[in-house]
């Protein structure tokens, strides 16, 4: 059928908030359990339920701040709930799935289907951002007639005529087979808190949180 009924975005978000609140309540009910109760099967936090709670609240905060332009009252109330309950604030609590076989290496390193966009590369190049070394691979560039190693991003929508030539001309994500899958980190949660303060709280607090988020990103 060409007339399939779809849930509205509002219905989807409402259901997601309900499910997430149910999960948070369940986690809170099990806070007293020792970490070894779930640790064997938990590749993210090794059974630490307090850390799972921080991640769940951080997800709620992320969802809430995506509603600021369409449901500002709901965004504010849900974000306030999440912040009050406690979100990720340190890199030690970052949500990462640990693995000995990160399969995204197939996408980035083997198949060569992805390269870094010019927008982020140009921005970070402009600030000589030291995080590039940890995030991206280098490529050979020509500057003043000399070959150098640097970072180059590909423009969105560019016409790729030769994949082999293209993949060697632009920087890639730096990913190894033992890298964890990052789901959410303290920097993102802190940037979201800064946005919350900027919209509904204190501009001074927003500035402080913004700087904290930048620091957390560099420390990571």
Predicted regions and their residues:
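Structured, solvent-exposed acidic/aromatic patches
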Residues: 1-220
């Amino acid at each position: 059928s060409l007339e399939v009924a779809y849930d509205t975005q509002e219905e989807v978000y409402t259901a997601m908030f309900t499910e997430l609140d149910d999960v948070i309540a369940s986690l809170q009910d099990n806070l007293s359990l020792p970490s070894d109760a779930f640790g064997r099967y938990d590749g993210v936090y090794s059974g630490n339920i307090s850390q799972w709670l921080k991640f769940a609240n951080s997800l709620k905060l992320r969802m809430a701040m995506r509603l600021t332009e369409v449901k500002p009252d709901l965004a504010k109330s849900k974000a306030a709930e999440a912040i009050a309950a406690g979100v990720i604030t340190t890199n030690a609590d970052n949500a990462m799935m640990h693995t000995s076989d990160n399969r995204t290496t197939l996408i980035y390193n083997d198949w060569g289907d992805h390269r870094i966009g010019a927008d982020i590369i140009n921005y970070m190049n402009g600030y000589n951002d030291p995080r590039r070394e940890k995030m991206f691979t280098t490529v050979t560039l020509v500057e003043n007639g000399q070959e150098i190693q640097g970072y180059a991003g590909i423009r969105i929508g560019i016409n790729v005529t030769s994949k082999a030539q293209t993949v060697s001309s632009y920087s890639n994500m730096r990913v190894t087979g033992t890298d964890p899958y990052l789901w959410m980190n303290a920097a993102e949660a802190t940037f979201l808190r800064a946005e919350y303060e900027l919209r509904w709280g204190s501009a001074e607090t927003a500035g402080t949180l913004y700087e904290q988020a930048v620091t957390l990103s560099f420390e990571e």
